[in-house]
Amino acid sequence: MAEGQVLVLDGRGHLLGRLAAIVAKQVLLGRKVVVVRCEGINISGNFYRNKLNYLAFLRKRMNTNPSRGPYDFRAPSRIFWRTVRGMLPHKTKRGQAALDRLKVFDGIPPPYDKKKRMVVPAALKVVRLKPTRKFAYLGRLAHEVGWKYQAVTATLEEKRKEKAKIHYRKKKQLMRLRKQAEKNVEKKIDKYTEVLKTHGLLV
């Protein structure tokens, strides 16, 4: 699949289950999906209850030989990946191929920091959850059950945002200069513009 057809989603502010369901459907249909900022994904319900549920889930193991599984993930990106896996027939070739089309990241690593990121309105917390309802952050939950890189991810995100601000300022300045340059030569190129319009080359 072409690079332009990769769907880059920003996980921040989305509900875990709803986003996972939409992503699962897209990868089954053959689209390549990349989900960034998984630490900003939300889970409905208060934090304490979600933490108890996840800790209960972590306690499940094979009594005779725990090394045989189940294997539990602590990073937000891997928790999201496993949620999507549960919505796919991952033990079949079709399901495995679909799972291979999904990439998940904590923070926004290169080259995705330079690409346009999309949101899914059907999975956004502000759209789907009443303002009075409680919710938890996947990043905080992951941190409290053993994820060690919350501070590192936060630091890298701050650096990325600073770089993005500088880039945006430069872009605005260039756009302003371009508009000014176009305005300066507008009268000089009027006759050429009219000729191009008559030939249908300029609208």
UniProtKB/Swiss-Prot annotation:
The modification N6-acetyllysine is found at K191. It comes from the Eukaryota. GO terms for biological process: negative regulation of formation of translation preinitiation complex; negative regulation of translation; translation. GO terms for cellular component: cytosolic large ribosomal subunit; GAIT complex; ribosome. Coiled coil: none annotated. The modification Citrulline is found at R59, R140. This is Large ribosomal subunit protein uL13. The gene is RPL13A.
